[in-house]
């Protein structure tokens, strides 16, 4: 028995866990976005 790869990408899971709406939903998430804007990130969230 071998162990499986732990990263099994799914678009829905990615956006629900790390997406923009999820970030905007909490005050800490908004802080994350503010930090990334201040740093000049091209992509703010998944």
UniProtKB/Swiss-Prot annotation:
The organism's place on the tree of life at top rank: Bacteria
Keyword Lipid biosynthesis: no
Chain residue ranges for the region called Disordered: 26-46
Keyword Ribosomal protein tagged: yes
Gene Ontology biological process terms from the UniProt entry: translation
Pfam families the record matches: Ribosomal_L34
Keywords annotated in UniProt: Ribonucleoprotein, Ribosomal protein
Gene Ontology MF annotations: structural constituent of ribosome
One GO cellular component term: ribonucleoprotein complex
Biased segments, Basic residues type: 32-46
PANTHER family: LARGE RIBOSOMAL SUBUNIT PROTEIN BL34M, MITOCHONDRIAL RIBOSOMAL PROTEIN 34 FAMILY MEMBER
Family stated for the protein in its record: Belongs to the bacterial ribosomal protein bL34 family.
Protein name (Swiss-Prot/TrEMBL): Large ribosomal subunit protein bL34
The organism of origin for this protein: Lactobacillus delbrueckii subsp. bulgaricus (strain ATCC 11842 / DSM 20081 / BCRC 10696 / JCM 1002 / NBRC 13953 / NCIMB 11778 / NCTC 12712 / WDCM 00102 / Lb 14)
Lineage: Bacteria, Bacillati, Bacillota, Bacilli, Lactobacillales
Name of the gene: rpmH
């Amino acid at each position: 028995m071998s162990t499986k790869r732990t990263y099994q990408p799914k678009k829905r899971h990615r956006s629900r866990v790390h997406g923009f709406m999820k970030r905007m939903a909490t005050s800490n998430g908004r802080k994350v976005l503010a930090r990334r804007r201040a740093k000049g990130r091209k992509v703010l969230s998944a």
